[in-house]
Amino acid sequence: MKLDKLAKTAVAALEDIKGRDIVVLDVKRMTSLFDTMIVVGADSNRQGRALSSSLQERVKALGARVYGVEGEQVGEWILVDLGSVVVHVMQHATRKYYNLEELWAPPRPRARRPRARKAAKPS
């Protein structure tokens, strides 16, 4: 997946504050609301808020807009809406519980089972 400049800036900002297990998902084919979802782990509320703050500063410095931020007061799960990119900053237990990566992952092709043949009738 080729990342646009906004997504690359977001990932760089999260890496600078030591965000854990950064996952970037291309969700263009699943929703018309946004193109890219980024999920990042935080070790604490404090780190979660720092990740969110760093992300917002870097995006604004790029000249892009931050459309909204939810959950910063608590810090357990912070959502940062950047328009075409949505970033979820989550503490590990919350991330594991909601498992957004699997929920938004592209569907895997199902393996087909061979059909059982009907047994021949004895003569």
Give residue spans per PLM region:
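Long, contiguous binding/interaction regions
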Residues: M1-R29, D43-A50, E57, G71-E72, ...
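Short amphipathic alpha-helical segments
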Residues: F34-T36
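Short hydrophobic/aromatic beta-strand micro-patches
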Residues: V39-G41
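Conserved short hydrophobic interaction patches
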Residues: S54-R58, L62
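Active-site phosphate-binding and catalytic loops of NTP-dependent enzymes
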Residues: A61-V69
